[in-house]
Amino acid sequence: MPEVKVKKGQELNGLGTMLKEIMDANLKDPKKYKRIEKLKGSMVIRESTSGVAVTLHIKGGEVELQNDAIDKPTAFMEAGFENLAYISSGQLSPIIAMLTGKLKAGGNLLMLLKVSNITVLK
């Protein structure tokens, strides 16, 4: 089964470490893997209070994480720590979070929704 790779020479920040654990577990599910298998692009996830960010690079079914945000991601999302925790634990739907203003998102929203299949514990 695929595993999330970490950009060479980097040690992930706390946000990246949390997401890697969740994504590694989710990618073991063939149905969830199939949803991202053909995706190509990058996604920035940022914690708004501290500015801590990670970038996911997805291509050909492989996922790589790196610290910090890149300049031009395909999609991005930003929320406070508590809301990111609620979203990643499955207690708050990413769609509801966007509609209620708890999550800022931009770029390719379809990609965000597809990637949420592996970034949320379910």
Predicted regions and their residues:
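Feature captures hydrophobic
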Residues: 1-122
